Amino acid sequence: MCGIAGIATQHAGSIAIEKLAHMAAAIQHRGPDGYGFYTGLHVGFAHVRLSIVDVAGGAQPLTNEDGQIVITYNGEVYNHVELRRQLESRGHVFRTRCDTEVLVHAYEEWGADMLSRLNGQFAFAISDSRDQSVFIARDRFGVRPLFFTVQRGSMYFASELKALLASGDIKAVVDPQALDEVFTFWATRPPRSGLSGIQALEPGTYGLWRDGRLRIHRYYELDFPEREVEPRDAIEQLDELMRMGVDLRMRADVPVGAYLSGGLDSSITATLAAAASPHTLRSFSITFDDPRLDESAHQRDAARAIGSMHSIATIGGNAIAECFPEVIWHAETPLIRTAPAPMFHLARLTKNAGIKVVLTGEGADELFLGYDLFKEVAVRRFCLRRPDSTMRPRLFDRLYPYLLDNGSGGEFWRRFFLEAGAPGDPLFSHLPRFQVTSWIKQFYSADFAAGLSGIDVVEELRQSLPTRFFRWSTLNQSAFLEMTLLLSPYLLSSQGDRMAMAHGVEGRFPFLDHRLFEFAAALPTGSRLRGLKEKEILRRWARRILPAAASARPKQPYRAPDVPSFFAPKAPEYIADALSGASIQATGVFSPTAVAGLVRRCRSGLATGFRENQALVAVLSTQLWHDQFVARPVYPRMLDIAGADVVLQDAIPVS
């Protein structure tokens, strides 16, 4: 895993390598093991490397034999060994063992059609001097980030926004609608990025830059074509796909570890990883000094069962508050939860243990309907059909005991979930979340709210739904929304890629093997969610490899301390400054008066509810984000060009 950046232009002359060195410096955390540059006619690439496959021979940018095709690449193609054999049988000659070179030859052989053959997580750019084009692409589920902007006849692209801004050519301007999306959906909807004029390349798409224009094309679409399948056959297929997915993701020339929360999904991936590893598996987890959030006992039990060497990062005191500015710097977006902060600490623990690659369980909840949200859909539909049922309160209590008992008002929340949307609304499953999150908007300043007049991000989402969406069951519609609104732009990004790569750690996700997704998406929903029992088929299969208690353990939502983290004794000084009336006024997103009231309630302990927690985190993170990227951005000094592993000019190696 690495970081990439580049510029393609229709203007005469080559790209200044110094500009590329500035862009690369801004993302060097993604690739601490080396860096390189390419400057050709109308194009320039930068690359920072995290060496995992072919450690000695995988420096980038990399060319084909005659230098006409050049690539800068972030990610992993797990089936590169099989693709290499196919390409060699067609006459291609390889100089390295790295998957990067496989992409170069795959592009030569198949062009854009290569993407359907790749099993991996990737974002890359390929310069083709034969037709003066640049080809950019992103993996099916958006595991790896890629941003771009087209300005004044040039296309700029990079793994992170800060690399684009570090070029010196692009000004950071707040996109108000993007922030409104964060405060509705938890994240921006691709292609928005948070900054006006800069877009995220959407998952499952590629772009072709030629003649001063960038054209975006889709090569992969999520689909849920339910088919009947014999339960025994389904279990056997699941067994094969899970083992293949993990085995492929164990391919590396460095040790591979695993994140192990103690839950079902991470226990599965870690167990299979331990079986496939030639060495004792290193596993890692986080816990909290708050006993209500402490799952360390389950984590240790899981590690003992697997036989892994386990390390735990305990998060307490001011740990979240102290790292929060760094978290925002790497996330590059306002947040409404502190959940990425413990993941930042977890990645640091992993790096300090000498591990660069970890397998994790992300994707299982979306594929196998593991979230409470999916059960909530079933409960809400039942309660709307049976308004007089005495089971209604008990069903909600079973779903959200922590929400109903934390001072938020249990009866209020029961009424709220019942009144949030009609079953015929295509967004029925997610409207409660949207409405709870949108509570933040009452703190908008008058000017910011006025700038959003006439914009309804929820209605825009409704209008954007694909035709096939309306053929699916309600639960599959819910899964689609969860994957497109939360998995890629938040869980795999702010909480995933950004926190891991802040410390040069690569996360790999066996549940996001596209073959496993396509299998799970075609299963009847009843085999994934039976009554209120989530992940039914996954649990049945897991009995083969996990202790009975682990395979039966109910889903535990990942929660991190929020408001108390920022008002503990000896809290960092930046908090008071960021939340001061003068700072709030200068940023302009929120009302100083409204925020002052929220801060007083939070500081006094009167505001302990879910919504107040979200609002405080939203305000503080927005203040930090605006300061770091808009008001007072500071970028690292440019990388030393003479120290590069490779410098290519006009596709001819010169050093």
What are these regions (language model features)?
Residues 334-337:
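Acceptor-substrate binding/catalytic loop of class I
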Residues 327-328, 372-379, 634-637:
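Short secondary-structure boundary/capping segments
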Residues 366-397:
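A mobile, often basic/glycine-rich helix-loop segment
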Residues 355-371:
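Short acidic/histidine-rich active-site segments
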